[in-house]
Each structure stands twice: as structure tokens, then as C-alpha cells.
């Protein structure tokens, strides 16, 4: 799967751009503020319905316009597919796939799986468990068609349970919701656990290439003691949950633990090593997607030269090429990427003040 055409209209400082990317490595270069990262952001927005740089989607709309429009043609094994997205400053979003209106943004994610390696994406290890849960759930969503419905139900029931706790409801009033919570939690947890087990098999080899001297152990924690029955735990923790006004334990507390010996990876590894570990996780996730459902991710790699030294840039780019996936990588100077590749980029784009030029 690859993008063979991308139209960007009124996205940040890009007034209008049309790209015909290669299915291999696409190098986008230009000075800071030129708009090169905005191209990656537009692709991500088209696949996720949101930005990886700002939580306020209205901010990505060009200041002089009331809406942005993104359009892409995807090359798929079954033939070409067309995706269109329009976001209005009012917050309304319109999405079409092959001319049909789409109501759920999850359909976009299913159609256009995207992996991001940016300065922001390194928060996967540097911040709390939320981003690591999102990492697991991205894979679980793509690997098992039952995951999304179960995950939506977990969120729905958890919201209802927390509202009852804030209302000081008796446990008898909460019991029905607990039965539902347990049922959907078991589904979500089983799929998450199975996914992390599969990821681990691929991850060992990739981590070995990036960090050959380091033994990293990866494990999934479900959000409560695995030796404890979840239904019994909810009942026994009811007084504590009532006091805090929210559910203390459960799938919303799940995490991906990475350890080196007895220490968390965050404490045992240097910042540079942690960045390589995040790269390994993203590449393993993309490779597993291909293995499980025979679909490539699209990799968006932003500002690589500032994040990794020349040796590790070369290693990461080799791994990306080996995936066989489509890659978009940005840099200020093209030589920083070209010199790290064994063969020239399949296509190069220069961006200046929001204008995109193909370099032949």
C-alpha cells in the first residue's frame, strides 16, 4: 500500500500543493518553517483525523481560510482507492472514501495505517503510560477486528461507572455496570496481551540491531494484578473508588513495560538509546502489521538528522528500506539523508514558504 497522489489545500502555510510520491523513500527538505513537516502532518491528519503536533485541529487550517481539504489516491492490492477529508474551522469534519461518506474516523485509521517517528513521538518512553497504551491499541485495533467495539464499550462503561461513583451510588447500583465492565475488559485485555506477545517476537531482532549490547525486556501490564480476579477486585476496591470518585484499577491503567535488568529502560538507557528503542518499536509494529494482515504502514519520519547521529541514521534508514513500506522523511539539508542511504531516495521534494517543488 502506498500514496500515489496527495493534494493539500489550506493546511498550515501550504496554500495548495500536489505531490506524486514514490512507493519507496521520499525525501522532503527545506529550511525550518518552510512547511516540510506540514506535509507529514497532512498525511497523518488524513489517516487519523487529527494532528500529531497540536490537540486543536482548527490550528492547522490556514489563517486566511475557513476550511482545509486533503485528498489522496492510495495504491492497494485490490486497486486504487481515494480518500478525501475536509475540516471546517467550526470543528465539523467531512470524510469520504471512494465517494462514500464515512462517519467514523476509525475507518480512516483502518484504511491508512501510519507510523510516526518525530521529536514528539519519543514521548512514548519519556512520559506516562497513556502514549504506550495508545501504541498497544493501535496494533490491537489493526490486528483484531473485534478490538475496536470492545474498546469503545470499555470506555462507555467506565464513564458510566465513574459517574455513579461521583454520585455516591451504592455498590448494588454499580453491580450491573461492573458485570459489563468485566466482560469487555476481558476482551480488550486478551487482544492487547496477544498483540504484545506477537510484537515481542519481532522486536527482539530489531532491538538487537539497534542496541546490540543491551538486553531489553518488554512486557504488558493489564492495569491490575494479574493474579487477582477483576470482578472481585472491583467489588473489594469499591470503597476506595468511591472515595476517589473514579475507578482506580482496570484496562485504562494498562501499560507497556520496558526494562533493562532490574531497571526501567527510561532509567537504564541514555536519551540517544531510548530514541533508538522507540524507532525499534515503531518498525516492529509496522512489520507485524504486514505479517498479520498483509498491509504496509506508511512511515513519517521528521527531522531525523537532529535526532540521531550519522551511524544510527544509516541504521534506521536501512531498517525502513527493508520493511518495503513507503517512507516520507524530512531534513533541512538533503545530504544528511542522501549520505545515509545506500541508494538515492526514490523521490525528492523541496519546500520553501509552503511551495513544494519536485527535484528531478
From Swiss-Prot:
Molecular function per GO: ATP binding; single-stranded DNA binding
Binding site for ATP: 30-37
Cellular component per GO, a single term: cytoplasm
GO terms of biological process kind: DNA replication; DNA synthesis involved in DNA repair; double-strand break repair; SOS response
Subcellular location: Cytoplasm
Primary location recorded for the protein, binned into one broad class: cytoplasm
InterPro entries referenced in this protein's UniProt entry, alphabetically: DNA-binding_RecF, DNA-binding_RecF_CS, P-loop_NTPase, RecF/RecN/SMC_N, RecF_2
Alphabetically ordered keywords of this record: ATP-binding, Cytoplasm, DNA damage, DNA repair, DNA replication, DNA-binding, Nucleotide-binding, SOS response
Superkingdom in the source lineage: Bacteria
Family: Belongs to the RecF family.
Function of the protein: The RecF protein is involved in DNA metabolism; it is required for DNA replication and normal SOS inducibility. RecF binds preferentially to single-stranded, linear DNA. It also seems to bind ATP.
Name the UniProt record assigns to this protein: DNA replication and repair protein RecF
Amino acid at each position: 500500500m502506498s500514496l500515489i497522489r496527495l493534494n493539500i489545500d489550506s493546511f498550515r502555510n501550504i496554500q495548495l500543493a500536489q505531490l506524486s510520491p514514490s512507493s519507496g523513500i521520499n525525501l522532503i527538505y527545506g529550511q525550518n518553517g518552510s512547511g516540510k513537516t506540514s506535509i507529514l502532518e497532512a498525511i497523518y491528519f488524513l489517516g487519523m483525523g487529527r494532528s500529531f503536533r497540536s490537540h486543536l485541529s482548527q490550528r492547522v487550517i490556514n489563517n486566511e481560510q475557513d476550511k482545509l481539504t486533503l485528498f489522496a489516491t492510495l495504491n492497494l492490492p485490490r486497486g486504487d482507492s481515494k480518500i478525501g477529508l475536509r475540516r471546517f474551522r467550526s470543528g465539523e469534519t467531512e470524510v469520504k472514501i471512494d465517494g462514500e461518506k464515512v462517519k467514523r474516523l476509525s475507518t480512516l485509521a483502518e484504511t491508512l495505517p501510519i507510523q510516526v517517528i518525530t521529536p514528539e513521538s519519543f514521548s512514548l518512553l519519556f512520559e506516562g503510560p497513556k502514549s504506550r497504551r495508545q501504541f498497544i491499541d493501535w496494533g490491537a485495533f489493526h490486528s483484531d477486528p473485534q478490538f475496536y467495539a470492545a474498546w469503545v464499550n470499555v470506555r462507555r462503561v467506565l464513564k458510566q461507572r465513574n459517574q455513579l461513583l461521583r454520585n455516591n451510588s451504592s455498590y448494588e447500583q454499580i453491580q450491573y455496570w461492573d458485570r459489563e465492565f468485566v466482560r469487555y475488559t476481558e476482551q480488550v485485555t486478551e487482544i492487547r496481551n496477544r498483540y504484545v506477545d506477537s510484537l515481542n517476537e519481532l522486536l527482539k531482532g530489531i532491538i538487537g540491531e539497534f542496541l546490540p549490547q543491551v538486553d531489553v525486556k518488554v512486557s504488558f501490564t493489564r492495569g491490575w494484578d494479574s493474579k487477582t480476579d477483576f470482578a472481585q477486585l472491583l467489588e473489594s476496591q469499591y470503597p476506595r473508588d468511591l472515595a476517589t470518585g473514579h475507578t482506580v484499577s482496570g484496562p485504562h491503567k494498562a501499560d507497556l513495560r520496558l526494562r533493562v535488568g532490574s531497571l526501567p529502560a527510561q532509567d537504564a538507557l541514555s536519551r540517544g538509546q531510548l530514541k533508538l528503542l522507540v524507532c525499534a518499536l515503531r518498525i516492529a509494529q509496522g512489520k507485524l502489521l504486514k505479517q498479520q494482515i498483509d498491509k504496509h504502514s506508511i512511515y513519517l519520519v521528521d527531522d531525523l538528522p537532529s535526532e540521531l547521529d550519522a551511524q544510527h541514521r544509516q541504521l534506521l534508514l536501512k531498517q525502513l528500506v527493508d520493511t518495503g513500506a513507503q517512507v516520507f522523511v524530512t531534513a533541512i539539508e538533503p545530504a544528511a539523508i542522501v549520505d545515509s542511504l545506500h541508494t538515492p531516495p526514490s523521490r525528492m521534494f523541496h519546500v520553501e514558504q509552503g511551495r513544494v517543488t519536485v527535484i528531478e
